[in-house]
């Protein structure tokens, strides 16, 4: 990709996420999902990995997605879009893995996650968020396996990159990319981000603008 093309995508991403993003729907079950309009991009990850914070940073809206220090606070599929626009919809998924909730409830929304990933025709990409301090865990690999079966393209995004040393971050990226070699549906490169410092946000916005451009052409 040329520098000129990069710059155009960065600007397209900036404009895309400068729009008036709003909450539109919350689905506690597959039966309550909204109609499949346009392109959907979902954000998955372990509980408390920073999905809601990332969505807020992308959109520049500090309170768009509810954030919490309590693992497992997001227990539904939360949908966001720009009113009057049907081109792109963002999905904040329940966190998987450890959560401060009854086991039956955790099992219910874990099932919801897997069913959504396997059966949503409008789902164009999933960003799987991994805490840069901890790397891939077994529960993450389970989700990657589900995504491999679903044939939905996905990419790993490291969160909280500002909380690790540059050398540690480089090692984390390298080991994660090596693990992805076993997953054919995964993008081979890993994005490092920080919601706090905005590291990687322009690149992530540009990647989504590129996807939207490809889908509309």
UniProtKB/Swiss-Prot annotation:
Binding, GTP: 45-52, 72-76, 92-95, 159-162, 193-195
Domain of life: Bacteria
UniProt GO cellular component terms: cytosol
InterPro entries with a match to the protein in the record: G_ENGB_dom (IPR030393), GTP-bd (IPR006073), GTP-bd_ribosome_bio_YsxC (IPR019987), P-loop_NTPase (IPR027417)
Gene3D superfamilies found in the cross-reference section: P-loop containing nucleotide triphosphate hydrolases (3.40.50.300)
GO MF term list: GTP binding; metal ion binding
UniProt-listed Pfam families: MMR_HSR1
An individual GO BP term: division septum assembly
Residues that bind Mg(2+): 52, 74
Key words, A-Z: Cell cycle, Cell division, GTP-binding, Magnesium, Metal-binding, Nucleotide-binding, Septation
Entry cofactors: Mg(2+)
The UniProt record lists the keyword Cell inner membrane: no
Keyword match Cell division: yes
Domain annotation EngB-type G: ranges: 37-214
Record function comment: Necessary for normal cell division and for the maintenance of normal septation.
Classification via HAMAP family: GTPase_EngB
Family of the protein in this entry: Belongs to the TRAFAC class TrmE-Era-EngA-EngB-Septin-like GTPase superfamily. EngB GTPase family.
NCBIfam families with a match to the protein in the record: GTPase_YsxC
Protein name, per record: Probable GTP-binding protein EngB
Organism: Bradyrhizobium diazoefficiens (strain JCM 10833 / BCRC 13528 / IAM 13628 / NBRC 14792 / USDA 110)
């Amino acid at each position: 990709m040329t520098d000129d093309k990069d710059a155009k995508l960065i600007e397209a991403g900036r404009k895309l996420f400068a729009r008036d993003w709003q909450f539109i729907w919350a689905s506690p079950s597959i039966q309550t999902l909204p109609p499949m309009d346009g392109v959907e991009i979902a954000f998955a990850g372990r509980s408390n990995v920073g999905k809601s914070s990332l969505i807020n940073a992308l959109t520049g809206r500090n309170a768009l997605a509810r954030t919490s220090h309590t693992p497992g606070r997001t227990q539904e599929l939360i949908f966001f879009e720009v009113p009057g626009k049907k081109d792109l919809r963002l999905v904040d998924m329940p966190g998987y893995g450890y959560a401060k909730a009854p086991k039956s409830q955790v099992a219910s929304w874990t099932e919801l996650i897997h069913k959504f990933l396997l059966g949503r025709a409008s789902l164009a990409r999933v960003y799987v968020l991994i805490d840069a301090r901890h790397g891939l865990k077994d529960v993450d690999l389970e989700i990657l396996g589900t995504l491999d079966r679903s044939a939905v393209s996905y990419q790993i995004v490291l969160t909280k990159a500002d909380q690790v040393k540059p050398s540690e971050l480089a090692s984390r990226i390298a080991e994660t990319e090596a693990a992805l070699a076993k997953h054919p549906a995964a993008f081979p490169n890993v994005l490092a981000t920080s919601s706090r410092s905005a590291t990687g946000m322009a690149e992530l916005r540009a990647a989504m603008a590129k996807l939207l451009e490809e889908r509309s052409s």
